[in-house]
């Protein structure tokens, strides 16, 4: 409603301005030229009215005669003359005798203000428009006219309700930050032994591990002013704005000291300085220089603690990482199985769970998941249960949600020919069988499916029994054999292969090359690393390439070893699938019948046992529900609402 009122007011002002301009420019309002009385009488008495200027008409208002002179050369002009009171009647008689039209006009007795307002209206309109324009610039969070002001948001305790009780799985990071909170609450406890509070804390870790959540917990626990800002809020298109915002941010911090300033994604402003297109005059470098000075420069900022977060510590400038600026570097790693169990318990506090839900089993089945992944898993499980009109979330919902998170959503509407479906079944059966036969050196098979998920026509999902922190050579070689299993199965069954193994070959080639050049797993090359990373400083080390620091002979040996690893894996997969051709056929047949096989069913097929019976869970889509509801309403309109049967 407020916006509509503003629009209506704007249209009213535009219409009034148009009327004022129209009145100002109308012929009646044009100013008349004052002339001498003799000139007026001469033009009144002109006889040759087709050649010389002559008077066409006269308007008499009080003692002022306004007359219109028609000049054949220059057109009509408006002139006026003021007559004395004694000879007004005689002059009027002369005008009438010369056959000039005479008009009498009453003296204007209207008030002064309406006319003044009409003349002042354009100026008022321009002032109002300028005021509205300035308010529009100042509106919102941008504040376009306050370029040099900091955009940091001061969070109050009422705005933030996250505490350390809501953080799980990263106990070491919590301990480090809780010590800083304790220092802020009781500084004398540490200062009596000569200790000082850390000036800065840098949280580093992969995306989704909980760095920003830790910062929100600090804001909820600190009991001191907490400023929050993103690294991208400093740099603008205008030169000097970033440095000005840094100064303003620390000025606010000094006024509210002791306080905490949190800079999220600090790599946006703290990237490595170096030679580039911008040189030393780059706006980002000016902002970084000002940030370095404010954090630990000539002037001290006692009581202002900087907490920053980044998932790219490798791109940060060394000057910002030194002690005195960031005294502590806290690595927020992926949680282990106990950490994942704790995160699951935090995120399921408000979710009604079924009696069959086991947090320990879920935690073991989600290796590599970070906090954001686990939160997404719980949310997907709750949504799946809601779509089935359940009252609680069961273990089946969590398993289906895990498959969706790991492998992508099912694309059951995708039309696949029987031939392609059969090829996909044998391809995935080859992966699964090789992985099962090499289970001593590889991760167990979690699920095999020929239902398209994401960009893939089928998937074989392997999950480790426990967190894997390193990789042996036997594991790497087994991984190569599993990757080759799909292509080899196509060769054995169909005598040819398809493009479906393209991604498998790419993964195998990358792994084999890393085994040779990085991990030292080749007996021929030895434990030597070849091809050091060449990092571009100006581009933020995003575009990296491996510099060739070896001879042509070594390059040929590397290529030969990569080829040998892959061909050996191909041969091993062929031998395993040839020796177990019958199991391969049973796996492919079961996939064509059931479309998806879990670990228990794969074990039963490989072990020669009968497949266990299962109840297929079909989640209705919203389009199916709408269609069913329409059919129900249509039937009710035709046959009427069915009455319940009488009880016997």
UniProtKB/Swiss-Prot annotation:
It is a multi-pass membrane protein. Zn(2+) binds at residues 427, 431, 504. Residues 622-648 are annotated as: Disordered. Its cofactor is Zn(2+). Keywords: ATP-binding, Cell inner membrane, Cell membrane, Hydrolase, Membrane, Metal-binding, Metalloprotease, Nucleotide-binding, Protease, Transmembrane, Transmembrane helix, Zinc. One of its GO terms (molecular function) is ATP hydrolysis activity. PROSITE patterns: AAA. The active site is at residue 428. The chain crosses the membrane at residues 7-27, 112-132. It comes from the Bacteria. It is found in: Cell inner membrane. Its EC number is 3.4.24.-. ATP binds at residues 205-212. GO terms for biological process: protein catabolic process; proteolysis. Its main location: membrane. It is an enzyme of class 3 (hydrolase). GO terms for cellular component: plasma membrane. Binds 1 zinc ion per subunit. Residues 1-6, 133-648 are cytoplasmic. Signal peptide: none annotated. PANTHER family: ATP-DEPENDENT ZINC METALLOPROTEASE YME1L1, METALLOPROTEASE M41 FTSH. In the central section; belongs to the AAA ATPase family. HAMAP family: FtsH. Acts as a processive, ATP-dependent zinc metallopeptidase for both cytoplasmic and membrane proteins. Plays a role in the quality control of integral membrane proteins. This is ATP-dependent zinc metalloprotease FtsH 4. It comes from Sorangium cellulosum (strain So ce56) (Polyangium cellulosum (strain So ce56)).
């Amino acid at each position: 409603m407020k916006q509509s009122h503003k629009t209506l007011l704007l249209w009213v002002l535009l219409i009034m301005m148009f009327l004022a301009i129209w009145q100002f420019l109308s012929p009646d309002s044009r100013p008349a030229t004052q002339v001498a009385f003799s000139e007026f009488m001469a033009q009144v008495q002109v006889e040759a009215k087709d050649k010389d200027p002559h008077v066409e008409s006269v308007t008499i208002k009080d003692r002022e005669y306004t007359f219109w002179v028609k000049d054949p050369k220059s057109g009509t002009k408006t002139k006026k003359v003021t007559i004395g009171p004694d000879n007004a009647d005689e002059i009027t008689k002369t005008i009438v005798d010369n056959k000039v039209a005479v008009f009498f006009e009453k003296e204007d007795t209207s008030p002064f203000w309406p006319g003044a307002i009409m003349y002042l209206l354009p100026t008022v309109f321009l002032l109002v428009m300028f005021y509205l324009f300035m308010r529009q610039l100042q509106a919102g969070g941008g504040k376009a006219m306050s370029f040099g002001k900091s955009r940091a948001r001061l969070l109050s305790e009422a705005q933030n309700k996250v505490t350390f009780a809501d953080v799980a799985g990263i106990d070491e990071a919590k301990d480090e930050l809780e010590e800083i909170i304790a220092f802020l609450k009781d500084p004398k406890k540490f200062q009596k032994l000569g200790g000082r509070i850390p000036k800065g804390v840098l949280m580093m870790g992969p995306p989704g591990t909980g760095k920003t959540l830790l910062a929100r917990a600090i804001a909820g626990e600190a009991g001191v002013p907490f400023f929050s800002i993103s690294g991208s809020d400093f740099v603008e298109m205008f030169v000097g704005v970033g440095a000005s915002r840094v100064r303003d941010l620390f000025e606010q911090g000094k006024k509210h000291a002791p306080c905490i300033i949190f800079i999220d994604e600090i790599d946006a402003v703290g990237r490595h300085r170096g030679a580039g297109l911008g040189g030393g005059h780059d706006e980002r470098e000016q902002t970084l220089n000002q940030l370095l000075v404010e954090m630990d420069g000539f002037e001290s900022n006692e009581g202002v603690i900087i907490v920053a977060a980044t998932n790219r510590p490798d791109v940060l400038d060394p000057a910002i990482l030194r002690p005195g600026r960031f005294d502590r570097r806290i690595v927020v790693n992926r949680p282990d199985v106990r950490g994942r169990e704790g995160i699951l318990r935090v995120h399921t506090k408000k979710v009604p769970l079924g009696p069959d839900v086991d947090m320990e089993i879920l935690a073991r089945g989600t290796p590599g998941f970070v906090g954001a992944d686990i939160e997404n898993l719980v949310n997907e499980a709750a949504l799946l249960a809601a779509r089935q009109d359940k009252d609680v979330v069961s273990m089946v919902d969590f398993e289906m949600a895990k498959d969706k998170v790991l492998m992508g959503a099912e694309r059951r509407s995708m039309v696949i020919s029987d031939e392609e479906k059969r090829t996909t079944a044998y391809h995935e059966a080859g992966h699964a069988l090789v992985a099962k036969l090499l289970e001593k050196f590889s991760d167990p098979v979690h699920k095999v499916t020929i239902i398209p998920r994401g960009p893939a026509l089928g998937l074989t999902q392997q999950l480790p029994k426990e967190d894997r922190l390193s990789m042996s050579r036997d594991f790497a070689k087994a991984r190569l054999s599993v990757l080759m299993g799909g292509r080899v199965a196509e060769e054995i069954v169909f005598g040819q292969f398809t493009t479906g193994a393209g991604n498998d070959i790419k993964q195998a080639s990358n792994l084999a090359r890393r085994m040779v050049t990085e991990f030292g797993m080749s007996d021929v090359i030895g434990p030597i690393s070849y091809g050091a990373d060449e990092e571009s400083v100006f581009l933020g080390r995003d575009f990296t390439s491996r510099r060739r620091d070896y001879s042509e002979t070594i390059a040929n040996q590397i290529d030969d070893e990569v080829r040998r690893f892959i061909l050996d894996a191909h041969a091993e997969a062929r031998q395993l699938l040839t020796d177990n051709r019958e199991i391969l056929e049973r796996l492919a047949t079961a996939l064509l019948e059931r479309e998806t096989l879990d670990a228990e069913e794969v074990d039963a097929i490989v072990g020669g046992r009968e497949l266990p019976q299962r109840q297929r869970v079909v989640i209705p889509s919203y389009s199916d529900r709408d269609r069913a509801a329409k059919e129900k309403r249509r039937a009710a309109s035709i046959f009427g609402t069915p009455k319940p049967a009488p009880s016997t």
